[in-house]
Amino acid sequence: MKVIFAGTPDFAAAALKAVAAAGFEIPLVLTQPDRPKGRGMQLTAPPVKQAALELGLRVEQPEKLRNNAEALQMLKEVEADVMVVAAYGLILPQEVLDTPKHGCLNIHASLLPRWRGAAPIQRAIEAGDAETGVCIMQMDIGLDTGDVVSEHRYAIQPTDTANEVHDALMEIGAAAVVADLQQLQSKGRLNAVKQPEEGVTYAQKLSKEEARIDWSKSAAVIERKIRAFNPVPAAWVEYQGKPMKIRRAEVVAQQGAAGEVLSCSADGLVVACGENALKITELQPAGGRRMNIAAFAAGRHIEAGTKL
């Protein structure tokens, strides 16, 4: 069975490796163009391209698929049975969706229809969801509105960051899409069910500005945001006129004026919130490295009563 693979980041690269390891023929891999990255802004290949080259697969990097006759012709010439799409980042027009014999399967990191859109992992943690998961979806022209082929649940742990949930769902998604491809190969079809009309939510892209901590919120809400926005864009506060990223914190039953430092020690930097307080245990000063609060407190002291 011929499988075209389209994806860009690590989440997708894991799935590509799994599909290849399962023995499926992959005549074409699509990924986004190389982009400048890092402090040196060096042109860097996306993880899917790196994985594809290691596997000896053909890689193409079109800037767009919409209104791109050359790319469409390339896809048609492959005569693929199905396309697997994972965090590709380009819009697939209807003519692309229709090109493979069995259409396009998307690996989406939420329990649809909850958290359609760009940042499902982060929004699930931020909202305090007890669980999330992966859906393998038969793509249509809408935003994550296609019929669901399979659903795989994951219980969000109380200390899970977005990075940790991402890594768990990356492995779940890779195994899930392989299982569905194997079913398609053996049975010639997949049983997909329509998404419920109730419970639709949208996971908007994250912004740096919304990552700024609002101390008038409850400590529980802020703690979830810190985990949801870890590692990027990272929840932050202004300290000495510069943004300081907050990496880890926990809720403590203390009270004070919102944004007021209650104590600073090797055990934690405690800041009052709208309800309860937050004990910060890991942070990252502007231009510095991530550090635990003991290392931070050894070189700096924030007086009780300071406003953040």
UniProtKB/Swiss-Prot annotation:
Entry keyword set: Protein biosynthesis, Transferase
Name of the protein described by the UniProt record: Methionyl-tRNA formyltransferase
PANTHER family per the UniProt record, alphabetical: METHIONYL-TRNA FORMYLTRANSFERASE, METHIONYL-TRNA FORMYLTRANSFERASE, MITOCHONDRIAL
GO cellular component: cytosol
Function: Attaches a formyl group to the free amino group of methionyl-tRNA(fMet). The formyl group appears to play a dual role in the initiator identity of N-formylmethionyl-tRNA by promoting its recognition by IF2 and preventing the misappropriation of this tRNA by the elongation apparatus.
Catalytic activity from the UniProt record: L-methionyl-tRNA(fMet) + (6R)-10-formyltetrahydrofolate = N-formyl-L-methionyl-tRNA(fMet) + (6S)-5,6,7,8-tetrahydrofolate + H(+)
Disulfide bonds: none
Any one Gene Ontology molecular-function term assigned to this protein's record: methionyl-tRNA formyltransferase activity
Organism, as annotated: Neisseria meningitidis serogroup A / serotype 4A (strain DSM 15465 / Z2491)
Family under the similarity heading: Belongs to the Fmt family.
PROSITE patterns recorded: GART
EC number annotated for this UniProt entry: 2.1.2.9
Any one Pfam family match given in the protein's UniProt record, by short name: Formyl_trans_N
Residues the record lists as binding (6S)-5,6,7,8-tetrahydrofolate: 110-113
Top-level division of the source organism's lineage: Bacteria
InterPro entries per the UniProt record, alphabetical: Fmt (IPR005794), Formyl_trans_C (IPR005793), Formyl_transf_N (IPR002376), Formyl_transf_N_sf (IPR036477), Formyl_transferase-like_C_sf (IPR011034), GART_AS (IPR001555), Met-tRNA-FMT_C (IPR044135), Met-tRNA-FMT_N (IPR041711)
